[in-house]
Regions:
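Residues forming the flavin
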Residues: 1-203
């Protein structure tokens, strides 16, 4: 999040790669590898409706994506947990305790606090980095109902002759939670189907 309010999409894949989330109090607050809708709701429930995404140098070394975030100035950094906490503006003792507790959880393969079951790596390789994040709408799943021919259905579930739809204006395609990247297939597949259906109807 930039000072002017503009923001950039940060991949959620970093959480699966070993990153953790802490709130503005320096504490973890949720299972980071839960579904995006649940994690987003948990972030919104935090002070300032935001969180910090924490990674270490070992993650940076393996990820051109993170290196790009650093180059773009999206991160704050510190040579120690205390220095990173200071750069983030959170309590140093609390954040350090959070990091130590997480590293112990990784070693034990057991997260007693939030039940996370994915432990890619401890965050022990200095320097450390944090990215300020907040949930934002970048895709909608609610909308008008279509059938397999991409025909728009009325309230009775009947196809409306000559009316077709595809993409984000439609609902029910992804269920309760969209998986990253699936929207591209949705647009392409139903876009093509709607075009074919419209062409067939025009014959």
């Amino acid at each position: 999040i930039e000072e002017d309010g503009n923001a950039h999409l940060i991949t959620e894949g970093l959480r699966g790669d070993g990153a953790i989330l802490v709130n503005t109090e320096g504490k973890r607050f949720y299972d980071e590898v839960s579904t995006r809708d649940k994690v987003s709701a948990a972030i919104i429930a935090q002070p300032e409706k935001s969180a910090w995404l924490i990674v270490d140098q070992s993650m940076v070394d393996k990820s051109a994506v993170i290196a790009g975030y650093i180059k773009s100035g999206y991160t704050v950094t510190g040579a120690t947990y205390e220095e990173l906490a200071k750069a983030m503006g959170v309590d140093e003792a609390t954040f350090t305790s959070t990091m130590n507790t997480w590293n112990q959880a990784v070693e034990a393969k057991s997260d007693a606090e939030f039940g996370r079951t994915s432990f890619a790596n401890p965050l022990t390789a200095a320097p450390y980095y944090a990215i300020k994040i907040t949930p934002a709408v970048h895709h909608t799943m609610g909308g008008i109902v279509i059938n397999p021919k991409a025909e728009v259905l009325n309230e009775k579930g009947e196809a409306i002759s000559g009316l077709y739809a595809a993409g984000e204006v439609t609902g029910g395609v992804h269920g309760a939670n969209r998986l990253g990247g699936n929207a591209v297939a949705d647009f392409v597949v139903f876009g093509r189907i709607s075009g074919q259906s419209a062409a067939d109807n025009a014959k």
